[in-house]
């Protein structure tokens, strides 16, 4: 049931795992949720109707890419990102900070914000906490992120602490800039690298700001999975139980299962779409590389039990041919399959938490991956 206000309700718990709903005027997001990434206003190789039919309640838009092209002001003139891109449900936008730190050229960072040159044409821009919130407002997203500084791991402790403290000050400025917007939310972002005391400090400070939701950033950036999970075990018990928790940029199906077990409610990642464009399929049997010659004369589908036409109705031989030939349809079908599998996984997770058997579901799912793909013909 939609609401004129932003709200989150936990409907069931199984250990630290939570099943619930985020309510917004544009729709309800069932959690745990996976958000397909629509970097430049499109989920690559997919129609928006397909994305919705697969079970996605919310998608992600990228502030950095959209501010550069076509421009936030232009999107606003065209009715906002929902109207512009044809997605009627909720949209979450990131702040642009991660891309500024990783993609932009000649960046200069100080207390005020960050100046940088576009990776597209070299044009100079300035991003401040206030400007980030302004851009996200022009895009008219439903959930907005604070501007933060994300350090690459490994990072010296002194540098990690400096970035974390700066991100906290920027969170305060973003909160002021966001103000009171009924039906929308701004999330703070917990930083602190792989250092527990810094993560604790960040989580406690953001909790004191009484924001509508909380993200965990700066993970899944090359560190071992155990480090990511250790940081979640530090952060999640600190964050308010009545607010949603979003792990940014994560991840693999295994990452998702283990993060849900530690109390995370929301995820996004380019992995299913990017992998689909490179010939890799996610299935109940684990990852399947359609480039491999073993599929060249295999008449079987990826998964005969799947509800997704891409997974069920096309032979592996045909998918192999499309991938090897560089045909656009190959990327489209494998992206469709991958997003279908991710939403199938999330649906199973939600049902398992509601039924109190999340541990059994996790064991059965991981056993399926471990058994591997069906034998070659």
Swiss-Prot record:
Transmembrane among keywords: no
Binding site for substrate: 94-98, 148, 191, 218
InterPro entries named among the record's database cross-references: ArchSynthase1/Queuine_TRR, TGT, TGT-like_sf, tRNA_ribo_trans-like
Pathway: tRNA modification; tRNA-queuosine biosynthesis
EC primary class: transferase
GO molecular-function term, one example from the UniProt record: tRNA-guanosine(34) queuine transglycosylase activity
Entries under PANTHER family matching the protein: QUEUINE TRNA-RIBOSYLTRANSFERASE
Annotated NCBIfam families: Q_tRNA_tgt, tgt_general
Record-given protein name: Queuine tRNA-ribosyltransferase
Lineage, highest ranks first: Bacteria, Pseudomonadati, Pseudomonadota, Alphaproteobacteria, Hyphomicrobiales
